[in-house]
Amino acid sequence: QPKATPSVTLFPPSSEELKTDKATLVCMVTDFYPGVMTVVWKADGTPITQGVETTQPFKQNNKYMATSYLLLTAKAWETHSNYSCQVTHEENTVEKSLSRAECS
């Protein structure tokens, strides 16, 4: 089966969630093969290790998908202006970013 580079989609926290003093960023990684990849979250370019949860890739239509979550407090979300989800798969790296200014 040919290799497939993942598609990466990054979702910001919802305004409803921010009202509860939480902020969850969701990085969806879809349509990749083989089913091994790593996710690195960054805040303003600095890797974040705390509050990261990544699901095990599962097979869907002969390819794999996984989701990674970055769990923050609303205050932490407001501390940085740019967040990114960097996915490394085989020799390819796909990075998606969002700036907080665009989400408010």
From Swiss-Prot:
GO terms for biological process: immunoglobulin mediated immune response. One of its GO terms (cellular component) is IgG immunoglobulin complex. It holds the Pfam family C1-set. One of its GO terms (molecular function) is antigen binding. PROSITE patterns: IG_LIKE (PS50835), IG_MHC (PS00290). It comes from the Eukaryota. Keywords: Disulfide bond, Immunoglobulin domain. Disulfide bonds join C27-C85. The keyword Membrane does not apply. Residues 6-99 form the Ig-like domain. Gene3D superfamilies: Immunoglobulins. This is Ig lambda-1 chain C region. The lineage of its organism: Eukaryota, Metazoa, Chordata, Craniata, Vertebrata.
